[in-house]
From Swiss-Prot:
It comes from the Bacteria. It comes from Bacillus subtilis (strain 168). This is Uracil-DNA glycosylase. Keywords: Cytoplasm, DNA damage, DNA repair, Hydrolase. Its EC number is 3.2.2.27. SMART domains: UDG, UreE_C. Excises uracil residues from the DNA which can arise as a result of misincorporation of dUMP residues by DNA polymerase or due to deamination of cytosine. It is an enzyme of class 3 (hydrolase). Belongs to the uracil-DNA glycosylase (UDG) superfamily. UNG family. GO terms for cellular component: cytoplasm. The keyword Ribonucleoprotein does not apply. Its main location: cytoplasm. The gene is ung.
Amino acid sequence: MKQLLQDSWWNQLKEEFEKPYYQELREMLKREYAEQTIYPDSRDIFNALHYTSYDDVKVVILGQDPYHGPGQAQGLSFSVKPGVKQPPSLKNIFLELQQDIGCSIPNHGSLVSWAKQGVLLLNTVLTVRRGQANSHKGKGWERLTDRIIDVLSERERPVIFILWGRHAQMKKERIDTSKHFIIESTHPSPFSARNGFFGSRPFSRANAYLEKMGEAPIDWCIKDL
């Protein structure tokens, strides 16, 4: 485990990895990866924590579970590997980004450049069976990702939580709003984007909070590959 995580996350979470629920989750994953097609690749499960250290987190964008189509998931919420078609929700995120800040829409869907700047792209469930959304829901991941939200909420340095849709907004109760900022709207899915996501300007609002705190803003524009 330790080699998959930044030291700062290991220090925050190492006790969690010793708990019985996590040991059970690990055993379940060993079976699932041996017998089923599971996404993302096992080496990519903790990419959100790998790319964005605990100390560097400025913004959190919460997702649900990984994309369940071949080659899509890369361990970062909403992000897909380069060369993979942009899923509908991600297309809508890029449309809002264009309207909000004026960024051109990139020719790929990888959000690694955000992660490297301090945007924690965290799904609440970190694995999924091919073609079966929510197939690893309720298996233990939520306890771990709740703990990740908790340790960020306990931090003195403010974090901006971007919560899109009801599933993400259920985590609001874990966030200390006397220290941290919440930006919320409907989900960018085609089913709900026109009911409040479009026009919500999450990217410029996040940068306004960062500048108010004396932090460098995020360069949300993603370069073509």
